[in-house]
A protein has these predicted regions:
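Peripheral, non-catalytic segments that deliver or gate enzyme domains
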Residues: 1-110, 122-140, 181-184
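Conserved hydrophobic/aromatic "anchor" residues
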Residues: 91, 112, 142, 216, ...
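Histidine-centered divalent metal-coordination motifs
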Residues: 100, 119, 309
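A fold-wide structural signal in alpha/beta-hydrolase
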Residues: 114, 138-148, 300
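Conserved beta-strand elements of the Class I
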Residues: 114-116, 270
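The conserved beta1-alpha1 loop
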Residues: 118-120, 273
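Active-site-proximal cap/loop segments of hydrolase catalytic domains
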Residues: 149-335
C-alpha cells in the first residue's frame, strides 16, 4: 500500500507477519510493526493514519491504528476469550537443521495425549496468533504440536524450496524432529499420539502413517492430495502446481504419492473431504478410502455436501461445528 514515506508491505517472518515500510528510494525497509504477531494487509492510508488487523497469542485479531510511530488498539474482540498459552518450540533435525514450532497444552499437569498438526501449502506457515483448531483440541485435553518444517514459508527461499521433488520424505524428517522436541519438554504421553492435517497437511498425514506408523495411534487426513497423477489432471491448479512441487518427471510422481504407500498403513484412519473441493477433488479421498478398506484397515470417510477446500475456515457454521465434533469423537475413541 503506497504512503507518503514508502510502500507498506507484509512479510512472513518465523511465524509472524511483519509490517514493513519500503522507501521509494530503495533503501532498507523500516519495521512498522514487528515481533511475535501477525498482521493483515493494512487499510488505505489517510490523514497520517494506517489501520491494520493484528493478531497475537491473546487474540485472533484486533484493529490497530498506526500514527506517528505509535499504536492504538481500536477493538477488543479477544477480551473475553479464555485462550490457552502458546509455547515456542525449537528442535533439531538429524542433519543439524533447526526446526521451529509451538505447543498449545491443555490445562493441568498431564501427561497429555499429543496431536501433531501439519499445515497445508506447503508454502505457508503456522504462527504465534490464536488458532481456533489448536485451541479447540487443547481445550479438549490434547497437547497440540505444530510447526514450520522445511517447505514452509517465512524462513527464506532455501527453506521453502528444500523439499521440491522429494516432498514426503524430506518433510517427514523435520516433522518428526519437532515431535521429538515437544515430547522432550515433558508432560506429554508419547504412547497416545495422533497425527492430522489438511491439504498438504493431509498428504503428510498419510505419508507419516505409512512410513512412520509406529509413532502414532491414529490419523485424520483432510482435503488431501493423495495421488499426484490424478491430481495433475483433476485439480484446479494441478497442471502447474504438480510440476513445480513434485518435479517435471511424471515417473517420479508415483513414488512421491502417499496413495502408493497406503498398503503400509495399519493405524485407524479418518478421511474428511468436501464434495465440491476443486483444489483436491473428492476422488483423492475416495481412492485412499477404498484402498484402506479393502485391506481391512479401520477407516472412516466423512464427506461434506456443498463445501469446498476451505470448509474448515469458511464453510457453513453447522458444517464447521460438525467437523470439530467428528474430529474430537475420533480422538476420543482412539487416543
Amino acid at each position: 500500500m503506497p504512503t507518503a514515506g514508502g510502500v507498506l508491505v507484509t512479510v512472513e517472518n518465523r511465524g509472524a507477519r511483519d509490517l514493513l515500510r519500503v522507501p521509494y528510494a530503495g533503501t532498507e525497509p523500516d519495521v512498522v510493526i514487528g515481533g511475535p504477531r501477525a498482521r493483515s494487509t493494512p487499510s488505505p492510508h489517510a490523514a497520517g493514519v494506517t489501520v491494520a488487523a493484528v493478531a497475537d497469542a491473546r487474540t485472533p485479531g484486533e484493529l490497530v491504528a498506526l500514527r506517528d510511530g505509535g499504536e492504538t488498539t481500536l477493538t477488543s474482540f479477544g477480551r473475553d476469550l479464555d485462550v490457552l498459552p502458546i509455547e515456542e518450540l525449537n528442535g533439531t533435525a538429524p542433519d543439524g537443521y533447526p526446526v521451529h514450532g509451538w505447543i498449545v497444552r491443555p490445562a493441568g499437569e498431564g501427561p497429555h495425549p499429543v496431536l501433531l498438526m501439519i499445515h497445508g501449502g506447503p508454502f505457508t506457515q503456522y504462527g504465534w496468533h490464536v488458532f481456533d483448531e489448536a485451541q479447540v483440541y487443547a481445550s479438549a485435553g490434547y497437547a497440540v504440536v505444530m510447526g514450520n518444517p522445511r517447505g514452509s514459508s517465512g524462513y527464506g527461499q532455501a527453506h521453502g524450496r528444500h523439499i521440491i521433488g522429494d516432498v514426503g520424505r524430506l518433510s517427514a524428517i523435520d516433522l518428526l524432529a519437532l515431535l521429538d522436541a515437544a515430547l522432550a519438554t515433558g508432560g506429554l504421553d508419547a504412547s497416545r499420539t495422533g497425527v492430522l492435517g489438511g491439504s498438504h497437511g493431509g498428504f503428510m498425514t498419510t505419508w507419516l502413517a505409512a512410513h512412520h506408523g509406529e509413532r502414532f495411534k491414529a490419523a485424520i487426513s483432510e482435503r488431501a492430495l493423495n495421488a499426484i497423477d490424478s491430481f495433475h489432471g483433476s485439480s484446479d491448479i494441478g497442471w502447474s502446481f504438480t510440476r513445480d512441487l513434485y518435479g517435471e518427471d511424471p515417473a517420479r510422481w508415483v513414488e512421491q504419492s502417499p496413495l502408493t504407500h497406503a498398503d503400509k498403513i495399519e493405524i485407524p484412519f479418518l478421511i474428511i473431504h468436501s464434495e465440491h473441493d476443486w483444489r483436491c477433488p473428492v476422488e483423492q479421498a475416495q481412492r485412499l478410502f477404498v484402498k484402506l478398506r479393502l485391506r481391512g484397515v479401520e477407516t472412516e470417510l466423512l464427506l461434506f455436501p456443498g463445501e469446498g477446500h476451505e470448509l474448515s475456515r469458511s464453510g457453513l457454521p453447522s458444517h464447521r461445528a460438525a467437523r470439530f465434533e467428528a474430529v474430537l469423537d475420533w480422538w476420543g475413541r482412539h487416543l
